[in-house]
Design a protein with these regions (language model features):
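Structured catalytic core of nucleotide-sugar glycosyltransferases
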Residues: 1-124, 128-131, 156-168, 175-198, ...
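Hanks-type protein kinase catalytic core
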Residues: 143
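An anion-binding catalytic pocket shared by soluble metabolic enzymes
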Residues: 149-150
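Short aromatic/basic micro-patch
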Residues: 154-155, 214
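Active-site donor/metal-binding and catalytic loop motifs
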Residues: 199-213
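Non-catalytic, C-terminal membrane-associated alpha-helical segments of glycosyltransferases
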Residues: 210-224
Length: 235
């Protein structure tokens, strides 16, 4: 997947128009992953690898990556966050940047629930759970123009990330599991972020290895977040 990123990011449209840096957060994988990432980093000045010494979960991965980037980025930069397990194709970055420019939205989500989206390789049960969570968040949080509250493939304007981090400090991301994606979204909404979405194709069939998501535990946590987010995250 990293090789695919590099190939696409060397595309003249991005390199000449935007410039880029790739930050890879390795969450405690020492099965050869870290050595491979270091070799890639040595060959490309645009790549930074940060390694956790043990598996710490999605929330900490995002804290590590976003904190590192926030210190280097200026308010005019944009931040794209995506999974590196083959499920999120980098080809959508262009569409997301174009959508941001066209609409003026400050966060663009690659959505599983826009017309034209596809979900491939996900069991009917997980699809059902995801759809249920979507309805729950829509009713309880009601963020304008958002249909997909949990997909991690997003582009953010750094000025809003910086504003939220200034407000919440170390608690900008307090959730440890997959519900941190909802937390980030709502806290950005609190600081006035505007949102929009593009359709995309989630390729779960290309994911290597089993999912680390504990479905029942995540479902319970999703309900908790939906009920308490407005009180818990308001400022």
């Amino acid at each position: 997947m990293t090789a695919k990123w590099i190939k696409q990011l060397r595309d003249k449209r991005i390199k000449d128009k935007y410039g880029y840096e790739i930050v890879l957060v390795n969450d405690g994988s020492f099965d050869g992953t870290n050595n491979s990432l270091k070799k890639i980093q040595e060959k490309n000045e645009h790549i930074t690898v940060i390694t956790h010494q043990q598996n710490m979960g999605l929330g900490q991965v995002l804290r590590t990556g976003i904190t590192y980037i926030e210190k280097k980025a200026n308010e005019n930069d944009v931040l794209c966050i995506m999974d590196a397990d083959n499920t999120h194709d980098p080809c959508y970055i262009h569409s997301m940047l174009n959508k941001m420019k066209e609409t003026g939205a400050e966060c663009i989500i690659a959505s599983r629930y826009q017309k034209g989206s596809k979900i491939i390789g996900v069991s009917w049960f997980r699809n059902l759970m995801s759809y249920g969570a979507r309805l729950l968040y829509t009713v309880s949080l009601g963020i304008p123009n958002v249909k997909d509250y949990t997909c991690g493939y997003r582009i953010y304007k750094m000025k809003k990330i910086k504003k939220a981090m200034a407000l919440y400090g170390d608690q900008f991301i307090s959730e440890t599991g997959f519900t941190c994606m909802v937390e980030i979204l709502y806290k950005l909404y609190v600081v006035g972020t505007t949102f929009n979405e593009i359709p995309f194709e989630l390729r779960y069939d290309l994911k290597k290895g089993a999912s680390k998501m504990k479905v029942l535990k995540n479902a319970i946590k999703s309900i908790d977040i939906a009920i308490h987010a407005r009180r818990r995250y308001r400022y």
